[in-house]
């Protein structure tokens, strides 16, 4: 019995120090829940689910006009991580966003949303605590569509967000 208990304790302690999973919140231009899975020392997958509040729309002539969107999206990203110093890292990657968007000044218009984005930022893992803090910038391009792609709106979609995640 003691050997089995020792093996279980060793297995749990190794798993506790691996900390390949992170779950937390993002606040800023993008607000929501965030999950990050460290695949290996260079790559990670981060998926965020939440709401955003800004975008720039372009009309058919390519002229920019300001639009204020409230959107609800899921945003999976593939990231390259680079450790800069102990517990400080930079990341760069890309992803897609899928969801719904609504113009704040026209509440009866709800659009489907599909887009691609880049993602760049910095992160910090707090020593002796299972906590990761990050700051990221996500410029992107998205299309808003209404009723079977009858109406397409192109937007420059960008978000700046601060994240805090529990590492496990």
Predicted features and spans:
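Sec/Tat signal peptide C-region and signal peptidase I cleavage site
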Residues: 4, 14-20
């Amino acid at each position: 019995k003691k050997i089995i208990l020792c093996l279980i304790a060793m297995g749990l302690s190794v798993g506790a120090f691996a900390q390949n999973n992170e779950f937390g919140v993002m606040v800023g231009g993008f607000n929501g829940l965030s999950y990050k899975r460290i695949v290996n020392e260079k790559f990670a997958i981060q998926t965020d689910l939440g709401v955003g509040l800004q975008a720039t729309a372009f009309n058919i002539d390519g002229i920019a006009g300001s639009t204020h969107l409230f959107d609800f999206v899921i945003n999976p990203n593939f990231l390259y991580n680079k450790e800069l110093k102990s517990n400080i890292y930079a990341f760069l990657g890309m992803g897609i966003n899928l969801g719904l968007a609504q113009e704040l000044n026209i509440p009866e218009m709800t659009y489907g949303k599909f887009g691609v984005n880049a993602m760049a930022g910095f992160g910090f893992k707090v020593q002796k605590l299972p906590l990761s803090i990050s700051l990221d910038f996500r410029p992107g391009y998205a299309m808003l569509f209404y009723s079977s792609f009858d109406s397409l709106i192109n937007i420059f979609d960008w978000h700046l967000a601060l994240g805090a995640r529990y590492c496990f």
